[in-house]
């Protein structure tokens, strides 16, 4: 403790340097003056005689121990093992407690006992300590926390040993200062001055203040640092530290962050300060607020390994674990800190330690691709065969993570290569080990298996001398010569050269790279002093280096001591051994000798992660070899039990088969694939819905498909298998093989056989990135879990981690690619286009094809798209089901260690990748495969593979995915994505990749929308996992749809959505987090650009078509191409008439083409094509009229949209699509007809009407578009509500009116928004919308045009009454299904108007944006694509009759996974209208949604998120969303920020994903659901309300927010996923989606309180464009998945618009009346909303805010009228108002609220 001695000396009177320890105590007396008896402080620096480990015991006390001590000591010692009763006084609480404390335990343990026994909380409790009062002439002192209690002899003056528990203040020898003087000294100004002196190294001034009696134990109010911790982070602060210590600073005083000075020095890699502190008697084992030691922080932070060596040399304790069971060794491997790892192993770290997920350090290396660390572990004897709790070995984890080179290393490692440590670690001798054989002995014995030499270093009596290691190496060398004298010498020398001299410079070795050139645990204090004073004596070797690592000299070195060799830059160095003080021994060109470790860096022979295309390339290179055969390389065939069975699956039309298929993607059979017992086929069941069709037939997760309908599919690619399944229709005969490992009994069969999920690997990669992002996002949340440290550490290691993250990102993209199985390939796109009659996507193939971009963008895009579509990427969906059990939440099997949430993640991930992914399916599957891991990872940032630890690194793809799901409502991220799609097709593909780059004004907004979309996608994934194979089988469609959905949101959407996932745990509470981090990440994620590209591609490709018009109606080629990109956004936007249109408009004009070219096109192309039939519409038909109106409206908006005019005509057409849809549903149409009927156009402002007329013509022009544009697109202008657009694809165009009605009804909720419409301007739009729905009907014919693509999303808005569909001819139904407008089940039909299937036609709805803008914002109708997706679910069409409305086929198809899945059954039930994304649960919905939500929650994965997320997500998410959305709207196009945490509560991630967006609904579900149902009904009644929203249209351009709600709804709808989402969160999920409504006024938590319609109304209103819109959207949003849709809708760039009308829908849905707006519909709109003041004459849904005010007057509550009107509360909002909403509206009196609620019930009843 030379230092301590020095410190003492410095302290004031260098009492005797030779005995620094003694002096330390002495100094106290020495400075009788004002100098406080710092020594008495309780821990003399060295305490030569002190028994304490740190020799910290004050001299006096120890002497006591020796003298009087023996007796007392014995007293305390006697009890030794047994506890001793100690009386503890707590002066601050004026309490005294008698506690039994264990004398053999550290004081820290006794302190925790005391803290636990307190019944009052103490501020800054960590800085309270046990104080031994002065007695017998000895000064009182605080007991050092890391010394044993028995080392402090008890006071014999009292019957019971007495200690005080008090705040650590400076201990003064006597009262030298009176209170006044003391107070004067400790003013804020003085304390600040003191901190400044410390910062400036003003040692003299610091000493002067301390001499006056200043207490240095305080926190800086700004930074939270204390003087000692600040000094510990400074260079050359040795003297300063000594002065502070001697001035009474406590070595274990903690900063506000809970860190001691030792932690701070270690984190700063300040070896000199660390050495000084240790020499002053600090313990290396101080715990921070999380119970973690400096050594843990060192392993976590990386960098120069000298601090790690110093701590270990000073007997630092190994094996400290965080909340997730991660030890130092795990963290070192997680971040690739090789040198730290070697030091840890050398000092005895346990290589077999498992974290909460059962992952060992080798598993972590495999997961994070840390090859150098893995080599070190293997070389030192790590066991490769240890299985984590997911029953995976490190090799399997590496395969799952896609780290094939590392997997090869692990697999080929031979036991003969193991070289255990033959050297014995050296320890500092100065520390008194507790007990004769205290720590030293046990520690060496703890040596790891790699250490053959177990002889612990004899622990010499504690010697005051500094440890060898602590000295500079030069000194060390000399000391080596004479060990005995060395102690004394060392003291002096250390004082002299001590920390100052020595290889200060060298000791700070640069952070060791992967190769870990990090310094060896060299002890020398590393003062800045010259490297080596005199000759650096001989170097001392610690241990041999691991062979096989290659190093290059990065800087020259000239020898300065004996044995050193010169190095020149660029020379290859072979490292032979690691020495002390950061010196290594190596050979260079025949010269062998020592050199500083920081002069060399390890080089990786192959940089796998550097190339962005890695995943794809690597896969090509490696995956096939690992396909089937290699997975079981670890076990012999005899290890597997093969069980084959033939299952006959018979499903109903509207449902799926209930399984998710995963596997390799390939255009042609993969002949190279060799089936093995472990991996008998390329395609396998990733998940099977419990009690679903497949489940009942005996199929289980992990079963490999051998034959499908008699065709052998062992080597067949995913798409082909899906096609085979589809061909069979409702009957499927499959021959499957279950592979089970004999030894394993729990989920073994699934585990061993399941191919490693590629997604995991992707997730892994993503995980790194996702994790970091997510962790950071989650940090706040995780903090509670104690993950904060991991996060902080991650942050600290950020610089070093960054590369990993980047890699992860790029990998993530790759990974995402894997999920691309979902993603649409160029071929798929072409086929889709052909199917749709669209010209092939010119750019689509190219962009899709681009291997790299595609993989990157595709992966994410896929995810997004799938989410948006409601068909989650296969991977997600598959994973979800599997994960459900063991994925997101720790899988049950994995769950073993799910103690902390982080654990959950931790464990979750392993399961995720537990099954090896089939090689063939490699990339596609990838996306889902890793999800669990990802999640797990997320969960535990620092934990195991999938553990939170990973969080630091990029989040694994799965986690991200999960997050995205949760955040389904990504809000901002998508802006870029929107942009990308916007450009023309040709441009788009490339642009897509650059989605960010394409941020033209309009694009940008779209991009935002895109983000939304992405978010939506994320939820969709969860849902997907629920959906059966059929849905999944619509992979192409799904992909397309995803692309579509993603298209706008797409590019970054999926990825982003996922990314939030990383935050999975953390972000999920806010949901926002997601948005920002991941879900929303869409826009911001690294993959964003790729995503954009992907989206673009997808959009271009059938995907976007599939989303909107893909199958139902193929828009014109240009439309598809361009529109696709914009189509999604537009669709989404379109959904919300106002918001949607605005979004659309701002978004790619092309998508909105109608807008841009609408005017010209509209007029020129007066012929609209019927979306379903593809035949030209009669211009006079309602559909044509509606289309025309929409077109007109679009045209009027065109200018604003024009920026993205690509495919203007197409855009125009989309409007008609919607109309068409409406036309389809005659019943509904009729209901809405009065208000929205084609004749309604009259109602529409003239311009709008004209536009509507134009639209029809235009639609005719582009028959392809019309094909799927059944959406009943209410003219935008016509139907502001159109946004609501229930794209009902009624079976025939003849139901348009009714559809319109339905649409209107849905808007009913949004109608509130129309309320503003009621104002003069608004009124116009309102009526327009109404007219538009009828018009929409005609549009049906016309929508086929490009509109279809755009409209698809709009479609989502459409509510088809299921009954209606059933009533309509089956053919229509099929078409609708194709379009994605599957009619909702009859229950929904009753008035819900969930024209889910209609999603495709969604576009027209947006048309109603603003009274001013008569042009409908033609949103691409998602339905068509969805319909296409539906292909497999043609039955969906009939779903109208089916209550479940599996018909969500649009969505279901899109998110085939979720819809088909059993879950979807429920879901569909809940929200019939996926298409429109509002899954209104109408009457049924309320209940179903809950169950749905619950289901997901119930599932393991969901659960973990659910609890928190669910609740918070519902409220928070919605709220956040709302805020973001509102803000976004406010910002106009720009913000995509609304985070649509539109989680679909689907089985797949259901809960978690939904948790965010949906959580609200779920949590609020009871309310929300009921509200939703009533709202839905209201919606039905008031579809036009929604229509009114379009009024916002004009404003919406300006105020996308207004539009966005509808657009959102539309989007959702278009995203098949939306439906799925809505299905998943049947409760309010869809609504929740709508929830997103990104109203400009995010101010309302409305989002989260879906019920709070206040804001929503405004949203829907023209005013919606303002903040008002957001609120309305929220409530509606809650109801259905529309949010999802809407988010995709808003994808492109108008996040604000993203606030979709969805919320409107919600509100509407709230209205109980099932009739679709019959009365309102009949009137031209709710009449002019404004004019029709007499609220008695209108249905509640149609009330304007003024009607609401009149109604309040009528119930004698006029005093609240102003607030209600200010908040734009319209009739549709009223039923959704919650208690909080009322309070916000000024209704604070319970009586008033009850009166309002009672009056509302009477209204509902009337």
From Swiss-Prot:
The keyword Ligase does not apply. It comes from the Eukaryota. The modification Phosphoserine is found at residues 448, 450, 463, 470, 558, 770, 857, 866, 877, 966, 973, 1208, 1233, 1237, 1240, 1328, 1495, 1585, 1596, 1604, 1614, 1709, 1711, 1713. ANK repeats lie at residues 223-253, 257-286, 290-320, 324-353, 357-386, 390-420. Residues 546-605 form the SH3 domain. The modification Phosphothreonine is found at residues 988, 1204, 1309. Its main location: cytoplasm. GO terms for molecular function: actin binding; ionotropic glutamate receptor binding; scaffold protein binding; SH3 domain binding; synaptic receptor adaptor activity; zinc ion binding. Residues 407-416, 1173-1193, 1360-1370 have a biased composition (Basic and acidic residues). Residues 76-150 are annotated as: Intramolecular interaction with the ANK repeats. Changing residue 1045 to S: Found in a patient with neuropsychiatric disorders; uncertain significance. Expressed in the cerebral cortex and the cerebellum. Pfam families: Ank_2 (PF12796), PDZ_6 (PF17820), SAM_1 (PF00536), SH3_2 (PF07653). The keyword Nucleus does not apply. Changing residue 375 to C: Found in patients with neuropsychiatric disorders; uncertain significance; disrupts synaptic localization. PROSITE patterns: ANK_REP_REGION (PS50297), ANK_REPEAT (PS50088), PDZ (PS50106), SAM_DOMAIN (PS50105), SH3 (PS50002). The modification Phosphotyrosine is found at residues 197, 631, 1006. Keywords: Actin-binding, ANK repeat, Autism spectrum disorder, Cell projection, Chromosomal rearrangement, Coiled coil, Cytoplasm, Disease variant, Methylation, Phosphoprotein, Repeat, Schizophrenia, SH3 domain, SH3-binding, Synapse. Changing residue 1518 to T: Found in a patient with neuropsychiatric disorders; uncertain significance. Residues 407-467, 665-689, 760-853, 871-1021, 1115-1460, 1475-1525, 1546-1584, 1627-1664 are annotated as: Disordered. In isoform 1, the N-terminal region preceding the ANK repeats interacts with the 6 ANK repeats in an intramolecular manner, thereby restricting access to ligands, such as SHARPIN and SPTAN1. It is linked to A chromosomal aberration involving SHANK3 is found in patients with chromosome 22q13.3 deletion syndrome. Translocation t(12;22)(q24.1;q13.3) with APPL2/DIP13B. May homomultimerize via its SAM domain. Interacts with BAIAP2, DBNL and SLC17A7/VGLUT1. Interacts with DLGAP1/GKAP, GRM1/MGLUR1, GRM5/MGLUR5 and LZTS3 C-termini via its PDZ domain. Interacts with ABI1, HOMER1, HOMER2, HOMER3 and CTTN/cortactin SH3 domain. Is part of a complex with DLG4/PSD-95 and DLGAP1/GKAP. Interacts (via PDZ domain) with the GRIA1 subunit of the AMPA receptor (via PDZ-binding motif). Interacts with WASF1 and CYFIP2; the interactions mediate the association of SHANK3 with the WAVE1 complex. This is SH3 and multiple ankyrin repeat domains protein 3. It comes from Homo sapiens. The lineage of its organism: Eukaryota, Metazoa, Chordata, Craniata, Vertebrata.
